[in-house]
């Protein structure tokens, strides 16, 4: 109610309804950079701006139903968009505030670190040059193996020289791992010997049997 008075005039009273609009509260989302972990999960923090100081202890931001995920899991130099699913809300809001949902933030995924690359069970038959082995690496995450498709480009090869093996990684590039400065581990090649057996035969002029040691199946292991 507004009352206007002046001695020269008759008192006048005017009534006016004033509508109070809810105060806008904006939410800012910040995604945290992470090291490659093979997952889409993103860590996101939220802050609310616009809540009056006198209400700050009562009206609080609730983000329990909001989750962030990267658009893809791979490492890269550029920031990636983090998609927010779910909505923020205000605890103890009696209608005095209206909440604006946050925009999708961005963050970077850096490469994980491979600490060693090695081969196990490196062996071959004594009469061949072809090696059999199992490659592995320490530092791989989320159950990934050196044999996981798309883990790297190029060819990792194991080569032998004088009974020793070395791992050649020339031209190999890992999509999500850094192995700069890591020297692949070499070692001794296990040589599988032939299994001898006795093959008997008759010699001319000798009715008895003579023996000759050869590999089983005619030099086959």
Tell me what each language-model feature is.
Residues 1-221:
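Short loop/turn motifs that initiate or flank beta-strands
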């Amino acid at each position: 109610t507004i009352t206007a008075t002046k001695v020269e005039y008759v008192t006048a009273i005017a009534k006016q309804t004033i509508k109070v609009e809810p105060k806008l509260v904006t939410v800012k989302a910040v995604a945290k950079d992470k090291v490659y972990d093979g997952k889409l999960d993103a860590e996101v923090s939220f802050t609310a701006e616009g809540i009056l100081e006198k209400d700050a202890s009562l009206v609080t931001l609730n983000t329990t139903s909001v989750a962030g995920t990267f658009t893809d899991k791979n490492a890269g130099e550029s920031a990636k968009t983090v998609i927010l699913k779910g909505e923020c809300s205000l605890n103890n809001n009696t209608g005095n505030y209206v909440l604006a949902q946050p925009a999708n933030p961005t963050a970077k995924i850096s490469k994980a670190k491979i600490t060693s690359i090695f081969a196990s069970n490196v062996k071959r038959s004594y009469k061949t040059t072809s090696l059999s082995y199992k490659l592995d690496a320490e530092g791989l995450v989320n159950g990934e193996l050196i044999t996981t498709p798309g883990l790297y480009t190029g060819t990792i090869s194991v080569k032998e020289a004088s009974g020793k093996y070395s791992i050649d990684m020339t031209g190999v590039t890992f999509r999500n791992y850094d192995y700069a400065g890591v020297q692949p581990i070499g070692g001794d090649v296990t040589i599988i010997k032939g299994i001898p057996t006795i093959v008997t035969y008759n010699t001319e002029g000798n009715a008895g049997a003579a023996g000759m040691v050869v590999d089983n199946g005619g030099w086959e292991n």
